[in-house]
């Protein structure tokens, strides 16, 4: 995220104003848990996060739900309960936002939870007893959603999977896509990184590959 702040013309920071806070959190976690060898593949995604902002709670809910659904089938048992609760919490928030019955789940959420039946049953009991303060929009944005994406990234990094770096990159890519679907992009930041600024940023942090795209959404997500 320090790269993004520099390219956006902000001060050097891992919490840039140019990026939605939860998307920035996903990017930080993915970067922290990715190996040195895998980190270079993240650099090409940096311009994609610049200018993606917005206050719509759908952004938080969609990023968190996608993160939980990706990680839940592969994480250790002790983290499955946390992420199963995360899936149900996100679904409940989306039900409120979209005006659908609370308790109704999207097909992908149902199929994901079906892979971890014991954790899903525990999560259903836990969420049914949750007080109103824990289900509020304020609590979801400030505490629940950040906790979900953190546990998803940590769980993937520690999971027994063939390519944790690849899964972490997917976590970030789908968070970018979820944010882009609901956020507005700042038109002042929509022209892509200035080549000179990008080159300076690469030199400053050790030489990530130079971007040669004209727009953030023109990135090839391999």
Name every feature range the model reports, one short phrase each.
Residues 211-220:
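Eukaryotic low-complexity, non-globular regulatory regions
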Residues 12-204:
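Structured binding/interaction patches within domain cores
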